[in-house]
Regions:
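Conserved beta-loop-beta element that borders a ligand/cofactor-binding pocket
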Residues: 4-26
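A generic structural signal for alpha->beta connector loops
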Residues: 12-14, 98, 136
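Conserved beta-strand segments of alpha/beta enzyme cores
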Residues: 14-16, 72, 138
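Alpha-helical membrane-targeting segments
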Residues: 29-52, 93-126
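Alpha-helical substrate-binding/gating segment
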Residues: 32-41, 47-82
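Mid/C-terminal beta-alpha module of Rossmann-like enzyme folds, strongest
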Residues: 61, 65-116, 149
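Conserved C-terminal active-site "lid" loop/helix of NAD(P)H-dependent oxidoreductases
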Residues: 83-89, 113-138
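Amphipathic terminal alpha-helices
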Residues: 142-153
């Protein structure tokens, strides 16, 4: 809530700040599954959280926030917590990958290659959409499995 106060110029205007996880679309899933098929290592730690959201839920929440006159900060991430490892293994499952493993780049190499940007890969936030759910928004794809099933068709 503090972060939206700096944008408040007029008292009668509602401000919505969206904190959006990795947006899942068909093109992204196809690209990630190609990386896994070629056994290209994934940057980050396998135990880190991987906040994600289906693109249709972003559109759905924006429409919901307008029609419900919401204001404040909202986390737009899937309602189930997902680790890096379970995220990529789920992609393998839904894309029917023949490679049974996911390789992760060691943290020191990630820091070397990406510098300060490495924090994005190494420290996945444990983000839950509590306020989003409390706003009565109903996710179209609340679980990773439902999102991937839709994007794998």
């Amino acid at each position: 809530e503090k972060s939206t106060k700096i944008f408040r110029v007029f008292e009668d205007i509602d401000i919505i700040q969206l904190r959006i996880g990795v947006v899942l679309r068909k093109k992204i899933i196809n690209l990630l599954s190609l990386n896994l098929l070629l056994s290209i290592p994934v940057p980050g730690r396998k135990n880190n959280y991987f906040p994600w959201i289906h693109v249709d839920d972003i559109v759905g929440f924006v429409n919901h926030s307008i029609s419900s006159n919401l204001n404040g900060a909202f986390n737009l991430v899937g309602s189930e917590l997902t680790s890096h490892e379970s995220f990529f293994k789920s992609i393998q499952k839904y894309k029917k990958s023949i490679i049974p493993w996911v390789l992760f780049i060691p943290p020191n190499l990630v820091k070397l290659f990406f510098g300060k940007m490495s924090e994005m890969f190494l420290y996945g936030p444990k983000t839950k959409p509590i306020k989003t759910l409390n706003s009565k928004y109903k996710f179209k794809y609340p679980t990773l499995q439902e999102a991937l099933l839709n994007l794998s068709e």
